[in-house]
Swiss-Prot record:
Species annotation: Rhizobium etli (strain ATCC 51251 / DSM 11541 / JCM 21823 / NBRC 15573 / CFN 42)
Pfam families from the UniProt entry: CxxCxxCC
InterPro entries with a match to the protein in the record: Puta_zinc/iron-chelating_dom (IPR005358), UCP006173 (IPR008228)
Family: Belongs to the UPF0260 family.
Name this protein carries in UniProt: UPF0260 protein RHE_CH01262
HAMAP family reported in the protein's UniProt record: UPF0260 (MF_00676)
Domain of life: Bacteria
Length: 158
C-alpha cells in the first residue's frame, strides 16, 4: 500500500505531538532576534540569535526548559501559526498551513537532518549570539536573508 506521508494527509490540527515536532526543519531562523516597528507593525530579522540557539545544530540548547531562560520565546502552536507573519517562507509549519508541500531538503523528505544546512537554508554560520553584542545595537544587525533563503531552490519542491 502506498500511503501518503502524514504532512500530505493531515492538517496541522490533526497531527500528533511527535508529527508536529518533526515539522521543524532545524533551520534556526525562528530563533533569530527580530525588531518590530511599533507604528507599522513591520518585523525585521537580525543576524543575532537567541542565547539558547546552538549555532551548529541550529536547535535550541534548552528546548524543554527554554522559558526558564527566555520567557518571551514564542511557542509555535496549531492556533498561532496562521497568525505569525514573520515565519520564514521555507518554514514547514507555514508551508503545511498554507496547503503546500515540504521542500526537498526538509529532513522529513530527505531523511537527513543535514540537508537543511547543506542547501543553505539554515542559520548555520550566519549569526552572532545575543550574548556577544550590545542589545542596544540590534538594529545594526538587520538582514533580509531569512526571508529569501532558498529562493533559487523554491521550484524544487517535492
Amino acid at each position: 500500500m502506498n500511503e501518503l506521508p502524514f504532512w500530505k494527509s493531515k492538517t496541522l490540527a490533526e497531527m500528533t505531538a511527535a508529527e508536529w515536532e518533526s515539522l521543524c526543519d532545524g533551520c534556526g531562523l525562528c530563533c533569530l532576534n527580530k525588531i518590530e516597528e511599533w507604528d507599522s507593525g513591520d518585523v525585521y530579522f537580525t543576524s543575532v540569535s537567541c542565547k539558547l540557539l546552538d549555532g551548529h545544530s541550529c536547535r535550541c540548547s534548552s528546548y524543554e526548559t527554554r522559558w526558564d531562560f527566555v520567557p518571551d520565546c514564542v511557542q509555535l502552536t496549531r492556533e498561532n501559526v496562521p497568525e505569525i507573519a514573520w515565519l520564514p517562507p521555507t518554514c514547514g509549519y507555514r508551508l503545511i498551513n498554507e496547503g503546500r508541500d515540504l521542500y526537498w531538503w526538509h529532513p522529513l523528505v530527505s531523511g537527513d537532518p543535514e540537508t537543511v544546512h547543506a542547501a543553505g537554508i539554515s542559520a548555520r554560520g550566519r549569526t552572532i549570539n545575543e550574548t556577544e553584542i550590545d542589545i542596544d545595537d540590534l538594529e545594526d544587525y538587520v538582514v533580509d536573508w531569512p526571508l529569501t533563503v532558498g529562493e533559487e531552490k523554491n521550484e524544487e519542491e517535492a
